[in-house]
Regions:
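Long, charge-rich, low-complexity alpha-helical segments
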Residues: 34-92
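Acidic, low-complexity/disordered tracts enriched in E/D and polar residues
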Residues: 1-47
Length: 92
């Protein structure tokens, strides 16, 4: 797992796309020879991985949306992004 700071600015790298699979009615991350099906929360996080929002900003936005504590959300966001970064689905 990759350690992530609050000020890291995640983005989806070249060659990876966030896309809606209309056949399965699911959001997916598409990469060369790989596909990752996303749940609603993962999709909400990845939409904000635009190269502008930092991890703290993403966590704050999601805390507002889901009416949860920012610190709790940030822990989950960091864990998810760390796993995705280790698999090269996001860059920091």
């Amino acid at each position: 797992m990759i350690a992530i700071s609050d000020t890291a600015i995640p983005r989806i790298p070249r060659g990876v796309r966030l896309s809606q699979d209309r056949v399965r009615n699911r959001w997916v991350l598409l990469a060369p020879e790989r596909i990752l099906e996303l749940d609603e929360i993962a999709q909400a996080v990845l939409v904000l991985c635009d190269g502008v929002h930092d991890v703290a900003g993403i966590s704050t936005e999601l805390a507002k949306t889901y009416q949860a504590e920012t610190a709790e959300i940030m822990t989950d966001v960091k864990e998810m992004l760390g796993g995705l970064a280790a698999k090269h689905f996001v860059v920091l």
